[in-house]
């Protein structure tokens, strides 16, 4: 067992990790979206697991989804610092905040103000369906982590993740993997189910092998989408697979407009957009929609995409949107109008419509 001690402010927080054995409640998935789990990824998952325990027992942030939300906000702040070394709030530089130089008595207030400010920075935003910019979180979204010692530890961990100058595969997905397996998440369901990263990566590799290199060489419009994007796991898996398996890929074009995500959940959109920003996107195209299958903004993609990668919603006869049911009856005439149905039927009908004829749906 190797302790990781962070001296932050006036406190020292110790996170226990073991890089040779998984914690008893952490299984051994292929963490992140990398094809093979590296020591760095396993160490990151172990640190997230330790941070999860701190947040849950001492941070006052529950449930797991809320804890991951606060970690995501800190990742956004650290990314802002990476893109602007002079970033500051009320005369306090973000560099000092992440280096542990802000004392415990003021670290919470400084972090709250910094988070409010970063939401107004245009180059840390998302691109909406109409082409305008919008913040990852609403402008009035609060920063909720208010225990100074735990916040200092979280700042130190985030600084480690983004301060090394190398890209970390799917950090938010890795956080979910670790947090979802955490031993303290027993008070109610999370309501979030992630496709295992190994499955997402396998699907991305198969689909990307079917695409021609020419399709990826000059990306000027959306070519790969996930209409139910969650944390963006399929989108970053597609990017990783394209980067590794094709030559002369327009990586910048792929990140800024070539990959498109949509989701009903605004918090999922924040995580997905942040994941793409962490990969280098300048302004990711991820949208919050009322219904991914009937949203007018997504209708523009129908019949245009080279690939759709997704894990659609499922379960029960609970879908009752009249337009969605009418669209489904075009493929499944036996579906009764004006009666709730299993959303998987709608997904089969409409997801195939997103793709250009002859292209791939995963």
UniProtKB/Swiss-Prot annotation:
GO biological process: DNA restriction-modification system; methylation
Pfam families: N6_Mtase (PF02384)
MF (Gene Ontology): DNA binding; N-methyltransferase activity; site-specific DNA-methyltransferase (adenine-specific) activity
Catalytic activity: a 2'-deoxyadenosine in DNA + S-adenosyl-L-methionine = an N(6)-methyl-2'-deoxyadenosine in DNA + S-adenosyl-L-homocysteine + H(+)
N-terminal signal peptide: none
Superkingdom as given in the UniProt entry: Bacteria
InterPro entries found in the cross-reference section: DNA_methylase_A-5, DNA_methylase_N6_adenine_CS, SAM-dependent_MTases_sf, Type-I_RE_MTase_Subunit
Keywords, alphabetical: DNA-binding, Methyltransferase, Restriction system, S-adenosyl-L-methionine, Transferase
Main EC class the enzyme belongs to: transferase
EC annotation from Swiss-Prot or TrEMBL: 2.1.1.72
UniProt xrefs under PANTHER family: TYPE I RESTRICTION ENZYME HINDI METHYLASE SUBUNIT (PTHR42998:SF1), TYPE I RESTRICTION ENZYME HINDVIIP M PROTEIN-RELATED (PTHR42998)
Family: Belongs to the N(4)/N(6)-methyltransferase family.
Task performed by this protein: A gamma subtype methylase that recognizes the double-stranded sequence 5'-GATNNNNATC-3', methylates A-? on both strands, and protects the DNA from cleavage by the MamI endonuclease.
Protein's UniProt name: Type II methyltransferase M.MamI
Origin species: Microbacterium ammoniaphilum
